[in-house]
A protein has these predicted regions:
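Cell wall/extracellular polymer interaction/catalysis modules
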Residues: 1-122, 130-148
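A conserved hydrophobic position in a structured secondary element of the catalytic/binding core
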Residues: 127
Length: 148
């Protein structure tokens, strides 16, 4: 399947670095679905679905042992907030880039998330809500995303 999407402001790369605003090329597994329970009550998906809590964040602090992992928000650690007001993360699937044994500085918080206007991202892939809902119906726990 192909969907119109937006990518990182600085395009694609084969050599992702933290903060470069580039989307990594490759074939990657997808993580669990994180969703806003206050906005979506029932989702048609085979993915493991986890409600987003206000204290959820994704660590992008290269000095942290939790680099590129889901964390509880803390002022001590640099992070990307998962609970947002702008609706971009109402439905969010982490792209398993640099996640198994994260290499610090190689890039973090690469997600498949929502967009309303196809504005470029900081390295994520973003699609419209209707496309995400279609995608959620067809992807499985072992599905992969190909970024070329």
């Amino acid at each position: 399947f192909k969907f119109k999407c937006c990518i990182g402001k600085s395009g694609f790369t084969n050599h992702k670095k933290e903060g470069d605003k580039k989307t990594p090329r490759g074939v990657f597994k997808l993580g669990d679905l994180y969703y806003r329970k206050d906005k979506f009550s029932k989702l048609n998906t085979k993915l493991n679905s986890i409600p987003i809590k206000k204290n959820m964040g994704w660590c992008d602090d290269i000095n942290s042992k939790n680099y590129n992992k889901l964390i509880k928000v803390s002022k001590k650690v640099k992070h990307e907030k998962i609970f947002r007001k702008d609706n971009k993360y109402d439905l969010l699937i982490p792209i398993k880039y640099n996640t198994l044994k994260p290499i610090k500085g190689k890039g973090s918080a690469i997600f498949l998330h929502l967009t309303k206007d196809y504005k470029k991202t900081l390295g994520c892939i973003a699609i419209k809500l209707n496309d995400m809902l279609i995608l959620l119906k067809i992807i499985k726990k072992n599905s992969k995303i190909k970024i070329i």
